[in-house]
Amino acid sequence: MMRGRGLVNGFAMIAAALLAAGQACAEDGYALWLRHAPLEGEARARLARLDGAVYAGMAQDPTVALALDELYRGLDGLLARPAAERITIVDVRVPGSGPKGAFVYDCANPDVPGDGAFRVSGSAEAVRITAAAPIGCLYGTYALLRELGQGRAPADIQLSEAPAMPLRMLNHWDNPDGHVERGYAGRSIFDWWHLPEKLDPRMIDYARANASIGVNGVVVNNVNAKAFMLEPRYIAKLKRLADAWRPYGIRVYLSARFSAPRDIGGLATADPLDPQVAAWWKAKADEIYAAIPDFGGFLVKANSEGQPGPQDYGRSHAEGANMLAAAIGERGTVIWRAFVYRAEDSTDRTMQAYAEFQPLDGQFADNVILQIKNGPLDFQPREPFHPLFGAMQNTRVMLEAQITREYLGQASGIAYLAPLWKEVLDADTGRGGTVAQIVAPVGMAGVANVGSDRNWTGTHFDAANWYAFGRLAWNHALTSGQIAREWAAQTFTRDPKALRTIAAMMLGSREAVVDYTGPLGLAHLMGTSHHYGPAPWVCDLERPEWNPCYYHRANKDGIGFDRTATGSASLAQYAPSIAPQWSDPATTDPRLLLWFHRLAWAHRLPSGRTLWEELVARYDAGVAGVDRMAAAWASLAPAIDPERHAAVTADLAIQRKEARWWRDASLAYWQSVNGLALPSGIVPPAEPLSAYRQRAFPEAPGQ
């Protein structure tokens, strides 16, 4: 038995890293949802009565040691006490029932089934965290602190949880030079130049944040990968990250460039059926696993947007993926992205991934996962679910979501994305259940929005999307509202009235962005390359499917993309029980109307308005939604610290300006096409169309 502040002397390195990790000395957002702001009144008194001994079996396990340290951090904050007052009792003999005033850890209990599963049992006298493995105790600690941080009484906390999906992964689009593709929160957090000798303490805080929401895998580099990241010097760098993150239950993955045997291996080809190529990849995998025994595997973007792949040699995606899968063997996984479209394919771009991959169903190796974007186009503010979900019944598939807001405002304002992801997860595929039910046995990936900015995500509210991704990957049955309230209570305030206001802002924010950027199912109307701002007038890019005009198809007669049997027939890729709901404009959800149908401007909608009138009304609704958010946030000044309140106020001022820009530029363009007057009482665009067309942003971030 040991007593004192220190946890386990054998883990001094971990403790040192935790102490070195940057701590916010002001409310600057660095602490994210792990602020552990002091409780007040009876809530603090209830918790203080439990602030006695901590009994822990397996306390010398590094993950259990971290769980205890997280408990201490949380209690120190919630009770507003100095760390010097900590008292620890570490004992390998875990009491069968919790002593009074104690926290009890039982981290090797076979009665708790499932990897990462845990139970938290609270009473007025003790709180017990039980798990089958140390990682369950770490997750259980974060869950306990989440409940306490929302003001829950310890006696009322009764949790029994297991992750809904085994793989809960972040995909970083970070380049080794520090640039982040589609990144809007500064530079990359990965300091490759100084690894492996120097580990940035921020890597520990990053791991803490991920573990607190159940993220257990990280792809550290861009899918548009550099081959040299497979060289020995980078394997050594990756090993340092893997060693630091392992106690947090996080495995590292690499995006692999398919042509690496040719690029850095001295071979004349990267043909997956060439024995020398297969041998090169096998040797490379062996080299990585010798350094990192729990290496997760490779993520591959192949034959898409100029990236090399097996089709360069007349081979299929399955042949390419299976060659890599054989190299890795049972040690890890090959994650193969289904985001493909080709310049020489004149069919509807939204059909091409299905056409390429569905015929390959059942041909992929068991350790291959097909990673499918939420919709068939490209992370638009609203798309229908991807038709590949449910159509690959003999292939392991996972969902790819985008946490970074490439098409939803980038680094300005608020766009809470949990409702977007819930739309997809809850969608019935007509082929074996909802999207969530189909991907739950495998996993969910999110394109990260994390960068070097002090608050991690560029804006304070973008942290909610990182948080929501992790929570939904852990439990897709959670509602968007539940997650919003959880996050806001831990991030800003526990004041009930303020929480209701913040949650309402968040829940309406994505719909506002949809309305002022792409209402009624319009999509891909953004600026070229940087994807910032409106540009529905762009019609002359090299490839047709890069042009906004390709998608909206507006002229004086109408607007929209006919994807029914009379058009591209992409609707036929959905299950026969699902397609009919979108086949007739009269029964199509208005939110997807112009995604599936081309209609006359005078077409009458169920609202009683013409299509043109409804389109204008939606743009105005989007602007009004942002105005309401700004007013609601202004009302919260007494409840929010001045530093973050001012920062969000500035973000919303930018969003108000951008919403009007989108609205005005779009209406000016649609009027130039249809020749129609604005409905009575509608405010005209502030500038002529020519002024909007002249705006250029060569310096926009994230390109």
Residue ranges and their predicted role:
Residues A26-A124, A155:
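Acidic, contiguous N-terminal accessory segments
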Residues M1-F11:
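Bacterial N-terminal signal peptides that target proteins for export
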Residues G266-R485, T491, D495:
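Catalytic-core regions of glycoside hydrolase
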Residues A21-Q23:
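N-terminal signal peptide c-region/cleavage motif recognized by signal peptidases
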Residues A56-D61, V90-G96, Y105-N109, T130-A132, ...:
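Structural motif
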Residues A59-E70, G74, N109-K282, A290-G297, ...:
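Feature activates predominantly on carbohydrate-active enzymes
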Residues G10-L19:
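Sec-dependent N-terminal signal peptides
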Residues Q437-G702:
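C-terminal non-catalytic alpha-helical accessory regions
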